[in-house]
Each structure stands twice: as C-alpha cells, then as structure tokens.
A protein has these predicted regions:
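Glycine-rich phosphate-binding loops of nucleotide-dependent enzymes
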Residues: 2-239
C-alpha cells in the first residue's frame, strides 16, 4: 500500500521541447512509496516523452526529485538509484535466450544469485520458465513483453517506469500482465505506468493522471475517472 507523505518521485513545472514544439507543459505530479500510478492519454500526448525525461534520455526544464534529492540527469546514475525504465517496444536482444535477456537486467546488482533472481520472474510469468532457452526472436509478442518486464525487475527497481506494456497484445495476455503488475506492486515496488488502454490502466492503480497535448488535465482515483463523463466518452467508449 502507498505510504502517506513518503514521496518517491516529485515532478514540478516540467516543460519539455522538441525543436520549437512544446511537448510537456508545466507538468506536475507526485508518486508515493508503494503507489501504483497510471498516466493515461491519447497517442502523442507526451507520455513517452515524460518517461524519457525522467530516465535522463531527454532534457527538460523543471524540477524532478527522487527520494527527496534532485534526480541526476545521467541515465546510468538514474538506473543505479533504482529507477528502471521498461520502454515501449521491448528492445530485447533477438539472438539471445530468454534467460540471458533477463540476466542483462541485473547489471546494477553487485552480489546476486542468478537462479534465485530468475525464479522470481518465473513465478510471475511461468511461461518464461518453459521458454528459458529459446531465442527472444522466436517468442510471441506477449512473451517478449513479459521478458522485457522481467528484465526490468531483475534490476530490483524501487521505481518501475512502464511505457505502454500492453500495446498490440491480446486480452488474455493483458490480463496476465495486469495480474503480474499487481503482484509486483504488492511486493513493494512503486509503479508509474503510461498506458493508452484505459481499462488496463485503471485496473490496479491507486491514482491516475490524464495527460492531453502535454498538459495534466485531471488527477484522481480510478473510481473518479470511471465516473467522469469526458473520460467515459473519449476513453471508455461510453461505458
């Protein structure tokens, strides 16, 4: 459960530009320890840019702090702090096995038992145990996404950034990933999720932000979002 008053991530008045395009406009958000926060919004709203900026891959103007200190702008240092980004697109090593792809995520750990760490991932995604020796390129899209999430978890994140993890996946795979994310969050990992699939984004979140054309236009609980007429009409198909 979220720890009240214990903010892991604080972003204040963040502005990001691509050339002359103002992509993120005075974005302010907060994520508490143990919280599951979802950011919803249409394609092109700025969700990926926000995650790239948090991860140090894109420059921004504003304040980003992690556990009360300014977040460094060096991506390697950000990872060492425990902020792990699982980007859209999976980015696996196609000619490496599932096992070796997963182990690539443990590079920041000093002393660890590979088999013990892998077992945690296989408990979340049992199909990966069966696929352990297969090349990543032979996997289905859903299995590749499970490997990508598992690889991020191998770094023992304190804050896990997940960018569009269900894009193009079948409903049964989305359900498996949703269940895994709940277990991950229940184990104490703070999650910040960017997702176009709004029912998925609302399923296990504690709080939700709506980002449209680079602006945070709404913040609230999943229940408040489901009851909002604009959200219902635009993002939930009138449900």
């Amino acid at each position: 459960l979220p720890v009240e008053g214990s903010e892991v991530l604080v972003i204040e008045n963040l502005n990001v530009y691509y050339a002359k395009a103002h992509v993120l406009k005075n974005v302010t958000l907060r994520v508490s320890q143990g919280e599951f926060v979802s950011i919803i919004g249409p394609n092109g709203a700025g969700k990926t840019t926000l995650f790239r900026t948090i991860s140090g891959l894109k420059d921004g103007h504003g304040r980003i702090s992690f556990n009360g200190s300014p977040l460094p702008r060096d991506p390697a240092k950000i990872v060492q702090l425990g902020v792990i980004h699982c980007p859209e697109g999976r980015h696996l090593f196609p000619e490496m096995s599932v096992r070796d792809n997963l182990l690539m995520g443990a590079f920041r750990l000093k002393d660890f038992d590979p088999d013990a760490e892998l077992e945690k991932i296989y408990q979340l995604f049992p199909i990966l145990r069966e696929r352990e020796r297969q090349m990543a390129r032979t996997l289905s899209g859903g299995e590749q996404q499970m490997v990508a999430i598992g690889r991020a978890l191998m770094g023992r994140p304190e804050l896990l950034l997940l960018d569009e993890p269900t894009l193009g996946l079948a409903p049964i795979v989305r359900k498996a990933i949703a269940d895994a994310l709940k277990q991950i969050n229940d184990s104490g990992v703070t999650i910040l999720l960017a997702e176009q699939n709004v029912p998925f984004a609302l399923a296990h979140a504690h709080r939700v932000y709506l980002l449209e054309t680079g602006v945070i236009v709404k913040e609230g609980t999943p229940e408040e979002f489901r009851a909002d007429a604009h959200v219902q009409h635009v993002y939930l198909g009138g449900v």
